Amino acid sequence: MIHFVKNIPIDENVPENYKEIVFGAGCFWGVERKFWDLPGVFLTSVGYSGGDIENPSYEDVCYRDTNHAEVVKVTYDSNVINLMDLLKIFWECHDPTQGMRQGNDIGTQYRSVIYTNNDDDLKVALKSKDIYQKELVKNNFKTDSLESITTEIEPVKNYYLAEEYHQQYLAKNPNGYCGIGGTGCSFPKL
């Protein structure tokens, strides 16, 4: 499988000093588009993560109770772009207070998630959540409670590559559906 935007194999061997992070923020088509062209991002792919069965299909994730989220795996050079920069894009591209949905896309597969590969990245992700929660409160974002961000943040449990037609979908289909939308609150400069 070839990455439609980067023109390299999606299963390309990751350079040793590169890092990976997994984001879920609604339909993976729009989320992937936010990351694939960023300087320092080596590769993106969409898949399913956090669920209870191995090698799920799109139909399994949508129509069965697999507990997977639609996600984007971002492989990046941390010497060019740091994790906090990626997290800024993640927080701003969707509404992390909506629980098991993003806009009109409803279901557990559309939940907000961050899955990390190590404890240091987990700490940074948790810190970024606290920063963004304070920003939502500061901007009087309409939420149910002061602890309104519902994003699941934990070590990556599994990652299964989605079908080829989902990979870089919005590059192949520029007028395709994208239901993600942010809160309008910017992640503060640190």
Please describe what each predicted stretch is.
Residues 1-190:
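Flexible coil/turn and secondary-structure edge motifs
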